[in-house]
């Protein structure tokens, strides 16, 4: 949308700015549908646990979080999944809403089914109140077409958040 040409006084320019902002605010959302968020417990004890959830038409996409951790007591974590309006992209975010986890993770892996990863990031600390996300060093984790996982020997046992953006897998005829 371009501004009409011609002379503008302060009132006309303000009116045009208000109309432009209104048009932007009222346009249909194009990004992600309303996400589904599910809570789950991350349990210490060194045993491998998994949690998964599906999203999309016909539960087209799956996000699975597999981990083993040591330390204190259970922590409540969340998994949020959403799809683009055309259902060609999906997001999976796994995180501890209280920010930093106090558990020591001996391993982790977040996998997607029905899609291929376009972007993934792992964080040692999740944003909470006035603090920002703190990403893991790239040498601590690896990303494949379908998973983000710890790198044995390089991962420093701190994990508080994982973010994945994936695109629908192409189906060949």
From Swiss-Prot:
It is found in: Secreted; Endoplasmic reticulum-Golgi intermediate compartment; Endoplasmic reticulum; Golgi apparatus. The keyword Chaperone does not apply. It comes from the Eukaryota. The keyword Endoplasmic reticulum applies. Keywords: Angiogenesis, Apoptosis, Endoplasmic reticulum, Golgi apparatus, Secreted, Signal. Expressed in eosinophils (at protein level). Expressed in bone marrow cells. Expressed in synovial tissue. Found in synovial fluid of patients with arthropaties. Induction: Up-regulated in response to myocardial infarction (MI). One of its GO terms (cellular component) is Golgi apparatus. Residues 1-31 form the signal peptide. GO terms for biological process: angiogenesis; apoptotic process; negative regulation of apoptotic process; positive regulation of angiogenesis; positive regulation of endothelial cell proliferation; positive regulation of MAPK cascade; positive regulation of phosphatidylinositol 3-kinase/protein kinase B signal transduction; positive regulation of protein phosphorylation. It holds the Pfam family UPF0556. PANTHER family: MYELOID-DERIVED GROWTH FACTOR (PTHR31230:SF1), MYELOID-DERIVED GROWTH FACTOR MYDGF (PTHR31230). Belongs to the MYDGF family. Bone marrow-derived monocyte and paracrine-acting protein that promotes cardiac myocyte survival and adaptive angiogenesis for cardiac protection and/or repair after myocardial infarction (MI). Stimulates endothelial cell proliferation through a MAPK1/3-, STAT3- and CCND1-mediated signaling pathway. Inhibits cardiac myocyte apoptosis in a PI3K/AKT-dependent signaling pathway. Involved in endothelial cell proliferation and angiogenesis. This is Myeloid-derived growth factor.
């Amino acid at each position: 949308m371009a501004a009409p040409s011609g002379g503008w006084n302060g009132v006309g320019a303000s009116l045009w700015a208000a109309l432009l902002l209104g048009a932007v605010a009222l346009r249909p959302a194009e990004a992600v549908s309303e996400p589904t968020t599910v809570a789950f417990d991350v349990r210490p004890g060194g045993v491998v646990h998994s949690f998964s959830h599906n999203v999309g038409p016909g539960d087209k996409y799956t996000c699975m979080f597999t981990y083993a951790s040591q330390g204190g007591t259970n922590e409540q974590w969340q998994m949020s999944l959403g799809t683009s309006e055309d259902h060609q992209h999906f997001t999976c975010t796994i995180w501890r809403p209280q920010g930093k986890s106090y558990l020591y993770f001996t391993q982790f892996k977040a996998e997607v089914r029905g899609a291929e990863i376009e972007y993934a990031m792992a964080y040692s600390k999740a944003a909470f109140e006035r603090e920002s996300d703190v990403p893991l060093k790239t040498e601590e984790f690896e990303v494949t077409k379908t998973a983000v996982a710890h790198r044995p020997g390089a991962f420093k046992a701190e994990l508080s958040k994982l973010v994945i953006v994936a695109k629908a897998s192409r189906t060949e005829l």
